[in-house]
Amino acid sequence: MDQELIKQCTEEAQKWLSPAFDAETQAEVKAMLDAEDKTALIDAFYQNLEFGTGGLRGIMGAGTNRMNKYIVGMATQGFANYINKAFAGKKDISVVVGHDCRNNSRLFAETVADIFSANGIKAYLFESLRPTPEISFAIRQLGAQAGVNITASHNPREYNGYKAYWDDGAQVLAPHDTGIIDEVNKVSIDQVKFEPNSDLIQIIGGEMDIDYLNAVHEALVDQNVINRQKDLCIVYSPLHGTGRVIIPAALRTWGFQNINVVKEQMVVDGDFPTVVSPNPENSEAMTLGMKLGTRLNADLVLASDPDADRLAVVCRDPQGEWCILNGNQTALMLSYYIIENKKKLGQLKGNEFMVKTIVTTETIAEIAQRNNVEIRDVYTGFKWIAREIKLDEGKKKYIGGGEESFGYLPFDKVRDKDSPASICLLCEIAAWAKDNGMTLYDLLMKIYLDYGFAYQNAISVTKPGKSGADEIKQMMEDFRATPPTQLGGSPVVCVKDYKTLKQTANGEVTDIDMPTTSNVLQWFTADGTKISVRPSGTEPKIKFYVEVKGEMECAKCYPSATAEAKKKVDAIKADLGL
């Protein structure tokens, strides 16, 4: 073991034995210092938990590389310093503070509110856990200058996090993101103002819930459909998280009457005892919901992740078996329904637009373009979708947007992923499908037949440690130096490099119109395949997103079309050396 590293970590840890830290923290640090095995000490102190463009995220515990009230305190002091500078001269500066169901989330949220108040900033603190989208909504509703949400979204139970929001209700973008980071990095623990000014802390809750529920209702497209199918059998699980506060109530306000919750998962619990991981992308997390759905002969099963920004949807296939939709399919169905039915109801005025991330299915673009709705591509991360809404506020009408990672926003009153609104709208879609003699699965097949079949596959390659980071960097450099000329048996006809913002097609180089650069490459082939590659911003991984087009002549052909598409994906993986 590196003795120099042990010495460095020991010196850093000994600072945490001072009276500035509570007895529990000191005891935890002392145990690490006294242990023969220094692995825990090194993990906790070898670096500072980085405050990045999205805030903080890390394992909870004592140490500089952990989520704890002291690291949260320094982050908040830096954020408060930046807010006071950015809004210098403004009389009443305020922030909204919310949190999810995780262990220590309430403690961290109260710490955040205390520090803001101590810095002369009014803190609207939610009375208890609330969904991420409601926190985004509250920032706008209260005219606050910023917000903080304590959440680690769908990460494992050991984690917690800190998301920073700006006055538009979206996560911070340039120049504020780097400005906040600079301020946070200047702060030492002795500069943190932990003593609250209780006059500047206001608890919020029930009234904001009502306002948010009223806003979510604006995402509804056709009330008549729900009125005819109000007994649609819905099963819902919040996976022990914040969705329990809002989503059953939201479904009732939309007019649904047969709402069944997974009782074991309605219990708020940061240990997530009924799932391996509280991630709705994992089929295992849906097991209890599907069991209840089978018992009730439900039409669909839905779940939200712990902070209720993302969702999962399960519907029945022609054999009556449960079929879990992927994030692309969910976004596709929502986009299709919004456009098709707003058009039928005469709700499209010609100034509408939709937004999708560059790695999300191109079929959404096909649907939008065919129906004269503008479609925009943005980078991954919902803050970029929020940016597009803000750019055209009051000029053009945002009607929906999403990403392949199970996040969607079907209205413009919120500026982050919104599972309450998306779940309500998916139930409306299921009601509309049932009204027309279809299931959600049948509707998906109809979309494929009308707009073309496409299959998506996301591949993550893990490369841990510094050597792994170097390898990922080299892979991206190699792809840029010698891009593939063919993939899956089809020639590459277009290359997009978002690091240089240049597109090469037919030997011609043109500019890509994006607000900033990003380390992403895309290859498009003659047969309609799209491959996107980017290093993960939060994990030691390089990610490949593959979308292949295929032939599907009838709904019964879906399994064979999928099998053929998987073969093509395997060929592409081989071509890329994966």
Residue ranges, per PLM feature:
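An N-terminal, well-structured beta->alpha segment
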Residues: 4, 8-112, 201-231, 242
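Gly/Ser/Thr-enriched, mixed-charge loops and adjacent short helices
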Residues: 16, 20, 24, 40-44, ...
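Conserved phosphate/anionic-ligand binding catalytic regions in large, soluble enzymes, centered on
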Residues: 45-65, 152-155, 234, 238-250, ...
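N-terminal small/polar loop signature for handling phosphorylated ligands or for N-terminal nucleophile
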Residues: 96-159, 257-313
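Short Gly/Thr/Asp-enriched flexible loops that form oxyanion-binding sites at enzyme active sites
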Residues: 108-116, 159-166, 309-329, 364
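Glycine-rich phosphate-binding loop plus the immediately following alpha-helix
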Residues: 165-193, 328-351, 356-366, 419
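Phosphate-binding and adjacent anionic-ligand microenvironments
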Residues: 294, 298-300, 321-323, 341-534, ...
